[in-house]
Amino acid sequence: NLDAKLRVHMRAEIGALHKRIGVTTVYVTHDQVEAMTMADRVVIMQGGVIQQIAAPDELFNNPANLFVAGFIGSPGMNFLNAELRNGALTLFGQTVTMPKARAHEGNFVVGLRPEHLTLGDAPVMFNVRPTLVESLGSEKYVYFDDGGARVADGEEGKSKGLIARVSHTGSLAGDEALPLGFDPAQLYLFD
């Protein structure tokens, strides 16, 4: 169990060694950061069943299912229940026209990565009252309630709040309404 700086250094050393030797290596880890940074291809398993095999960027950008979408990324993807009707969803009190046509309409779980939520101008805007703001220097994690957005149940079967990862070096007051937004092209729909 290495400290954070040493883990980063060791990942780089192992990655460089792997490239220098040029052999096929199977590396088993429960650490998604290790898997994403060190692998050419990653196998995501749940309960002994393969969920997806892909390059790290493919896993992140095109997750095969809810499990993969929730597993890859830190913080994890936000999930909301929504109904697609006439090519549009209602999220955060806003009608969101979906840019990609779906073969069928109905109920979906919508995925939205925390880093795809932005402060300020975006095609779809809404206001939140943060329940917590964590400052990490160059970025902040803004936790907020669903505001009636119908958050999909988490793995434990309990509804959870939402999180935005925003690039912001100034201070954010946790008790003031914040304008958040997103681009509908960055939404994921899961049956």
Regions found by a protein language model. Give the residues of each.
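Non-catalytic connector elements of ABC transporters
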Residues: 75-77, 86-191
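ABC ATPase nucleotide-binding domains
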Residues: 1-67
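C-terminal boundary and immediately downstream tail of ABC-type ATPase nucleotide-binding domains
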Residues: 62-85, 111
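Internal, well-ordered alpha-helical scaffold/interface segments
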Residues: 57, 66-70, 106, 115
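Residues located in well-ordered beta-strands
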Residues: 55, 67, 81-83, 127-131
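Residues that scaffold the ATP/ADP-binding catalytic core of kinase and kinase-like folds
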Residues: 9, 62, 70-71, 120, ...
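Generic alpha-helical hydrophobic packing signal
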Residues: 15, 41, 50, 56, ...
